[in-house]
Curated annotation (Swiss-Prot):
<keyword id="KW-0472">Membrane</keyword>
<comment type="subunit">
    <text>Alpha-beta TR is a heterodimer composed of an alpha and beta chain; disulfide-linked. The alpha-beta TR is associated with the transmembrane signaling CD3 coreceptor proteins to form the TR-CD3 (TcR or TCR). The assembly of alpha-beta TR heterodimers with CD3 occurs in the endoplasmic reticulum where a single alpha-beta TR heterodimer associates with one CD3D-CD3E heterodimer, one CD3G-CD3E heterodimer and one CD247 homodimer forming a stable octameric structure. CD3D-CD3E and CD3G-CD3E heterodimers preferentially associate with TR alpha and TR beta chains, respectively.</text>
</comment>
<feature type="disulfide bond">
    <location>
        <begin position="44"/>
        <end position="109"/>
    </location>
</feature>
<keyword id="KW-0325">Glycoprotein</keyword>
<keyword id="KW-0675">Receptor</keyword>
<dbReference type="InterPro" id="IPR036179">
    <property type="entry name" value="Ig-like_dom_sf"/>
</dbReference>
<feature type="glycosylation site" description="N-linked (GlcNAc...) asparagine">
    <location>
        <position position="84"/>
    </location>
</feature>
<keyword id="KW-1064">Adaptive immunity</keyword>
<dbReference type="InterPro" id="IPR013783">
    <property type="entry name" value="Ig-like_fold"/>
</dbReference>
<dbReference type="Pfam" id="PF07686">
    <property type="entry name" value="V-set"/>
</dbReference>
<keyword id="KW-0391">Immunity</keyword>
<dbReference type="InterPro" id="IPR013106">
    <property type="entry name" value="Ig_V-set"/>
</dbReference>
<dbReference type="GO" id="GO:0042101">
    <property type="term" value="C:T cell receptor complex"/>
</dbReference>
<feature type="domain" description="Ig-like">
    <location>
        <begin position="22"/>
        <end position="112"/>
    </location>
</feature>
<dbReference type="InterPro" id="IPR007110">
    <property type="entry name" value="Ig-like_dom"/>
</dbReference>
<dbReference type="GO" id="GO:0002250">
    <property type="term" value="P:adaptive immune response"/>
</dbReference>
<feature type="signal peptide">
    <location>
        <begin position="1"/>
        <end position="21"/>
    </location>
</feature>
């Protein structure tokens, strides 16, 4: 008998795509529904007048944001547990390997 895979819900993007003068940050996709064990992938793009760093955050319902990792220069790749992130000149991608039900949350990036 084939084991049924349970869907895992990950809500991505506070949809903050905030803008401040010339600075903009946009997220995609707005919603993910990967299966348990899959790789979830999300990205943010940005257009800023000055870049210092990019941070990825996770926020569970009813809780404050939790910092996941920081990245400082284009071409940078960082791994932390099941999280893997890449930083390009105008964007970043976050990957969660072996997705689990407890990964369900809102994920977003912020640029400083």
């Amino acid at each position: 008998m084939e084991k049924m895979r349970r869907p895992v819900l990950i809500i991505f993007c506070l949809c903050l795509g905030w803008a401040n003068g010339e600075n903009q940050v946009e997220h995609s996709p707005h919603f993910l529904g990967p299966q348990q064990g899959d790789v979830a992938s999300m990205s943010c793009t940005y257009s800023v007048s000055r870049f210092n760093n990019l941070q990825w955050y996770r926020q569970n319902t009813g809780m404050g944001p939790k910092h996941l990792l920081s990245m400082y220069s284009a071409g940078y790749e960082k791994q932390k547990g099941r999280l893997n992130a890449t930083l390009l000149k105008n964007g970043s991608s976050l990957y969660i390997t072996a997705v689990q039900p407890e990964d369900s949350a809102t994920y977003f990036c912020a640029v400083d």
